[in-house]
C-alpha cells in the first residue's frame, strides 16, 4: 500500500505550528530551512507540491509578547494578521535560497464552497504548480469566525487536496501518527500503520486536542483524511520530528499512519460532483461533441455546442444533451450562460475575440464532467 505514497506525483503538505516555532518564541528559521530543503528535494524528484502552513497566530503571539494563546476572537485575528507577514517572508526567503519561487494564497472555507471562487482558485493553483512555484496556503484567519478556534488548517489542507486533485495529503504533526491508545498515557500503545480512512474504529482512538499553539488534535486530522478521501487522495499522518521524514516517505519507508480511500481519485470525485450539485441549465451538443465526451472522455469545447438553455453562472452544474434530447453528461461550466451564448460554435482560439478574455479554453473541463 505504501506504493501509493512513493508513486504520488502531487502532494499537499500541511505543517503544524509546533513544527515551525521555537517553543513558542517565534518562528524557528532553522527548522523552516530544513523543511524547505526536504520540499526542494521532492521538487527535484518531480513531485508537484502545495504547502499548507500553520504558524501565523503563533508567530504573531511572539511578536506581541504573548505567552498564552488568547481566547478572544479579535485578539486571535490580530495575532494572525501580524504573524502572517513574518511567516510568508520566512518561507519566501528560505525557498529563494534554493532558486524556488513561492506564492501566498489565503483562503476561507467559503472560497471553496462557492463554485465560481472554487474554479478561480483551482485555475490559479494549477497554473502555479505547472510553473514550478510552491503555493503557500493558510486560512485567512483575519476574516473567519469560528474556524480559527478548531485547528481547521487540517481541514483546509484536505479541501486544498480536493481542489488540486492531489494524490497524497501529508499532515505533519508533533506525534508519530495515530495510535490504538493514547501513547502519553499508555506505554503499550501501538502505531496504526495503515487503515481505511472511513474505518469507524478510528474514531475511538482519535480523541484529544492540539497543543498550546495550535488547536488541531487527532480528531481534526482524521476528519481531514476522510475529506481528502472523497476525492481519492491518500493521507499520511506522520511525526514532523522524524529526520528526513518527507524523503523517507517518498522512498517508501513505513512511517506514520497511511489512511486510504475506498475509491480511486477520479471515481470518488465524479461521485461527489454527481451527488451534491443541482443543475442550472442545459447545453445541446452536436454529434461530434457527443462522441468526444462519450467515447473519448474529452473536455467539452465551445465549438461542439449548438444551444444554451437556462440561466447559470460560472461554476454551476449544467446538463449536456444530444441533439435528440438524451442526457449525455453533467458538468461544471467554466462560463456563465450569457458568456456561453457568445462562444458556442466557435473554436477555443476565438473565445478572446468574442468575450475579450478567456477564463478557460474548455466550456467544461473533463475533470468537472460526469458521464450519465
Curated annotation (Swiss-Prot):
Domain PUA: where?
280-358
Pfam families named in the record: AA_kinase, PUA
Q: Which reaction does it catalyse?
A: L-glutamate + ATP = L-glutamyl 5-phosphate + ADP
Q: Which UniProt keywords apply?
A: Amino-acid biosynthesis, ATP-binding, Cytoplasm, Kinase, Nucleotide-binding, Proline biosynthesis, Transferase
Instruction: Name its species.
Output: Pseudomonas syringae pv. tomato (strain ATCC BAA-871 / DC3000)
In this chain, ATP is annotated as bound at: 14, 173-174
Q: What is its main location?
A: cytoplasm
- What name is this protein filed under? Glutamate 5-kinase
Q: Which family does it belong to?
A: Belongs to the glutamate 5-kinase family.
Q: Which residues bind substrate?
A: 54, 141, 153
Amino acid at each position: 500500500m505504501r506504493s501509493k505514497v512513493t508513486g504520488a506525483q502531487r502532494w499537499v503538505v500541511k505543517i503544524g505550528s509546533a513544527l515551525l516555532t521555537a517553543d513558542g518564541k517565534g518562528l524557528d528559521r532553522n527548522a523552516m530551512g530544513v523543511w524547505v530543503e526536504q520540499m526542494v528535494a521532492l521538487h527535484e524528484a518531480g513531485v508537484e507540491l502545495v504547502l499548507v502552513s500553520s504558524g501565523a497566530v503563533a508567530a504573531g503571539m511572539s511578536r506581541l509578547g504573548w505567552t498564552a494563546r488568547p481566547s478572544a476572537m479579535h485578539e486571535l485575528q490580530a495575532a494572525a494578521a501580524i504573524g502572517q507577514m513574518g511567516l510568508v517572508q520566512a518561507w519566501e526567503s528560505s525557498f529563494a535560497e534554493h532558486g524556488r519561487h513561492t506564492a501566498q494564497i489565503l483562503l476561507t472555507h467559503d472560497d471553496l464552497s462557492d463554485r465560481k471562487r472554487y474554479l478561480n482558485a483551482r485555475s490559479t493553483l494549477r497554473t502555479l504548480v505547472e510553473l514550478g512555484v510552491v503555493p503557500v496556503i493558510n486560512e485567512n484567519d483575519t476574516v473567519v469566525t469560528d474556524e480559527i478556534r478548531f485547528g481547521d488548517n487540517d481541514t483546509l489542507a484536505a479541501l486544498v487536496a480536493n481542489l488540486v486533485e492531489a494524490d497524497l495529503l501529508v499532515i505533519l504533526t508533533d506525534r508519530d501518527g495515530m495510535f490504538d491508545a493514547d501513547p502519553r498515557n499508555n506505554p503499550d500503545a501501538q502505531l496504526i500503520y495503515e487503515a481505511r480512512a472511513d474505518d469507524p474504529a478510528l474514531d475511538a482512538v482519535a480523541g484529544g486536542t492540539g497543543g498550546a499553539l495550535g488547536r488541531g488534535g487527532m480528531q481534526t486530522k482524521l476528519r481531514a483524511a476522510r475529506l481528502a478521501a472523497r476525492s481519492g487522495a491518500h493521507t499520511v499522518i506522520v511525526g514532523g520530528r522524524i529526520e528526513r521524514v518527507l524523503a523517507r516517505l517518498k522512498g517508501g519507508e513505513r512511517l506514520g499512519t497511511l489512511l486510504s480511500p475506498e475509491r480511486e481519485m477520479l471515481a470518488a470525485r465524479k461521485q461527489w460532483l454527481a451527488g451534491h450539485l443541482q443543475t442550472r441549465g442545459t447545453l445541446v451538443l452536436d454529434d461530434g461533441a457527443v462522441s468526444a465526451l462519450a467515447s473519448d472522455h474529452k473536455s467539452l469545447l465551445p465549438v461542439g455546442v449548438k444551444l444554451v438553455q437556462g440561466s447559470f453562472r460560472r461554476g454551476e452544474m449544467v446538463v449536456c444533451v444530444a441533439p435528440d434530447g438524451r442526457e449525455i453528461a453533467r458538468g461544471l461550466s467554466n462560463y456563465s450562460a450569457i458568456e456561453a451564448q457568445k462562444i458556442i460554435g466557435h473554436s477555443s482560439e476565438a473565445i478572446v475575440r468574442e468575450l475579450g478574455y478567456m477564463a478557460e479554453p474548455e466550456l467544461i473541463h473533463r475533470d468537472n464532467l460526469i458521464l450519465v
